[in-house]
Amino acid sequence: MTEADLRLREREARMKERFQRKSSHTSVRYLRRMKELGGAPEELTPFLETLDQIYTGMESADIPADVPAVGTYCVMAPQELIYAAGARPVKLCSGSYTAFSVGDDEVPRDACPLVKAAEGFMSVDTMPLYRDCRMMVVPVTCDCKKKIAGMLSAKREVVTLHVPVKKEDSDIELYVEELYFLMEKLEDMTGRRITYESLTAAMRMTGRASYELSRFLSYKKQIGVCETPEAA
């Protein structure tokens, strides 16, 4: 190994250490603010503990070892299919200024913050939540999602879904074909077939989760908007 290679490795190690320290510190502040809010239900505790485990402790999510994790970059990713195939969807929205700062040096300047944050998380590679994902599902809803899919494909298996923006038959037919392609990929990964029964159960579960999420969001009217640590 040359001296230049050693310097590069040392630089990458320092960058990862700074990223992990800053990201963890930021997560601690935000979680503390959330815990200090009044009126939050006790049922919120497991979610806060999970966030603390992943973003402060830098640990993997509590997913069984025999259940593959599938990263998703949009709410339009069909979680029902992922659950029905025996996998676990993980939302990777990349809302992190720390990751954005890293990605800002890796992608073109005109790229949007979402692209830069996504690249930052993947290039630093310190988050177990990202490393544990065996596949990424990226619904292409804008130009930045196209860029994200291209970047991720160099490091993970990526399935793109071109969500129709018009009600034309050709667009809908293409989207349906891509959904069937995603089903095949999921079944190959998990070794399980998506059946009517498994899909029905998954749809009921995600529907119930969406309903509970809407109830949770209603608490915003009662407790107000949480101030950011910087503004506090």
Regions found by a protein language model. Name each.
Residues D52-Q53, E59-S60, V67-T126:
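An N-terminal, globular interaction/scaffold subdomain
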Residues F121-D188:
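Acidic/His-rich segments in extracytoplasmic proteins that coordinate ligands and/or metal ions
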Residues D105, D169, E173, R193, ...:
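Charge-dense, low-complexity intrinsically disordered segments
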Residues T2-P68, E184-A232:
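A charged, amphipathic alpha-helical module
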Residues G71-T72, P89-C93, V137-V138, V159-H162, ...:
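A structural signal for short, well-ordered beta-strand segments and their strand-loop junctions
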Residues A65, A84, S153-K155:
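Short, well-ordered coil/turn elements that cap or connect secondary structure elements
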